[in-house]
A protein has these predicted regions:
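Short hydrophobic/aromatic-enriched beta-strand-loop microsegments
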Residues: 59-65, 135-137, 227-232
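Conserved ATPase-coupling elements of RecA-like P-loop NTPase cores
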Residues: 16-20
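Active-site phosphate-binding/coordination module
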Residues: 21-118
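Conserved acidic, metal-coordinating active-site core of Asp-based
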Residues: 105, 109-209
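Residue-level detector of anion-binding/catalytic polar loops
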Residues: 37, 170, 226-227
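Mg2+-dependent phosphoryl-transfer enzymes with acidic/Ser/Thr/Gly-rich catalytic loops
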Residues: 4, 21, 178-264
Length: 264
């Protein structure tokens, strides 16, 4: 049976503090040798993921900005993907709203709801908040679908969620930021659509694995055959009611390596 591996990045494939993936080397080599699609499923942007893929040495499909879109390299595994819309050198399936729509809401509510969005932050502020280097900050600001933000007053969260709903938007929580996005998107929907697409392309059922550590990974974990939670940097685990969930013994990329080696 063909397999797909979906993975969150920050705190899962990448270590929380230094963004390293060095401890995942053994599992990565086995994935590459087996030809299993390793699908980064992340809140990061297209530019961020493409740069990371270069460093990792892969060219695979990926899901960006919390399930907003699936990108597939042109001619991936020899498939005819001409039925999908073209986007630069990729094919794309879009599930989210445009960044312009999201920013319209953010700008209307940012002051009354005490939000500080990525689009309003200086590069220096983002470096301080995230630990990213200058190049990665530039990639992070190249957004197409969602707006990450810091909520200065947590008592405003419920009112903000209600307001977002009237715009067909929603608020989710990631590892460092809250995110404004289409209410019709999440990692789970993107994973479902990706599995369906690959089953059509392969003409057979696929087995799916997902690894994550944050609240915005729950929808992804709910829709795969093997859901795996990676231990957080503080030693805790994401709380979820997903059946048959597995937990890593280690944090970050070491925990990712540990769990992937069980199945590849």
């Amino acid at each position: 049976m063909k397999r797909l591996i979906f993975t969150d990045l920050d705190g899962t494939f990448l270590n929380h503090h230094n963004y390293s993936f060095e401890e995942s080397f053994e599992a990565l080599q086995k994935i590459k040798a087996a030809g299993v699609p390793l699908i980064f499923t992340t809140s990061k942007t297209k530019a961020e993921v493409e740069y990371l893929q270069e460093k990792v040495g892969i060219s695979e499909p990926f899901i960006v900005e919390n399930g907003a879109a699936l990108f597939i390299p042109e001619g991936y595994q020899g498939f005819d993907l001409s039925f999908l819309e073209k986007y630069d050198d990729k094919r794309i399936m879009v599930f989210g709203k445009s960044y312009a729509k999201v920013l319209e809401f953010y700008r209307r509510y940012k002051e009354r709801c005490s939000m500080a969005g990525l689009s309003d932050m200086s590069d220096e502020e983002i470096v301080h908040l995230t630990g990213l280097n200058q190049r990665d900050v530039i990639h992070a600001k190249q957004r197409d679908f969602t707006e990450p933000f810091i909520l200065k007053d947590k008592t405003k969260l419920e009112a903000l969620k209600k307001s977002a709903h009237t715009y067909e938007l929603k608020i989710t929580k990631g590892g460092r930021f809250y995110h404004i996005m289409s209410k019709f998107q999440d990692k789970g929907i993107a994973v479902i659509k990706t599995i369906e697409l690959f089953e059509d392309l392969y003409h057979e059922r696929v087995s799916s694995i997902a690894l994550g550590d944050s609240e915005n990974d729950i929808a992804m974990l709910e829709h795969v055959d093997i859901p795996i939670v990676i231990k957080k940097y503080d030693g805790s685990y994401l709380e979820t009611n997903v059946p048959h969930i597995q937990k890593s013994s280690y944090q970050g990329s070491k925990g990712w390596n540990e769990m992937v080696l069980k199945y590849v």
